[in-house]
Structure formats: structure tokens, C-alpha cells
Amino acid sequence: MTKNELVRIASQKTGIDQQTMLAAVEGIVDTLKEALIEKENVFIRGWGTWTLKHRAKKTARNISKNTTIEIAAHDIPYFKPCKEFLEAVAAS
């Protein structure tokens, strides 16, 4: 499902026009990104938790050039769905 499809379906379900729904969806996504950039966790009851997971520095191989490269330590976004969400998906 694309963002446009999500906006269209949510607009139909709620009766809110698509432009307003698009602004709401983009606002939520932007707020989620900003919170994670500031290293804050985001918890949405009934859906799940967005957190950051730290990845340590590691050595990898560039197989096309047959050389080793260093990958710096970095954080990645991680989503953990809540129990109710997992059960609903498993039951479908």
C-alpha cells in the first residue's frame, strides 16, 4: 500500500477530505522522524513502538573490488508491534 492509497482509504473511512488527510499523514510521519532523530521512542497504543537500535562498527567486504571496508557505528529505526497488533495479523 502506498501513501496515496493509505490517504484515499483513510479519507473514505473517516469522511475527511483527501487534502486534509494527506496533511495529517505527512504530519504524523514527519513527527515520527523528528522524534527518532532526537533519539526519542514513540509508543502508539494498539499499534506498537518505534525505537532506535544501535549497530556497532564492523568490517565488511566489497566483493566487486575484493577489498575490506569499515562500516561506522550507527543507529537504525526499529518497529516492534504490540501484542494486540500481532494477534490481529496472525488471526487474519
What are these regions (language model features)?
Residues 1-92:
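Strongly charged
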